[in-house]
């Protein structure tokens, strides 16, 4: 595996890990403010980011590269004021950072002729477009809702669809 591509993939592992813990922290914050639906939404986002990290981690191992094992202490001291719109704006910005990082890796893969990794990353390119669009749509809804408690209640409910239990 090309050393520059490996370095970029390791940066991506770290970024996906950071995103996972960021969303986990937001899940806790929304739960503490009794927005349990939005809390569950961010818990799912955290799980998705962790899955992305593991997918890249496994790929690096399969390619006989050496993936990093990220730490998790980096968000401990960060505090966030509870403003729903601002928190979703931060989330969209987080997704944009991930998208830019993926695009940077794809560009490097093209430059060095690493078509296997470029092909592997196409799933992430599509996934990031979907993630950014999801957060843009939520922010558009928040602009319409404003501070309307009924609208916030509905958003909270919408972001926490009922689960079906299989017995």
Give the location of each predicted region.
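Iron-associated oxidoreductase/ferritin-like identity signal
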Residues: 1-167
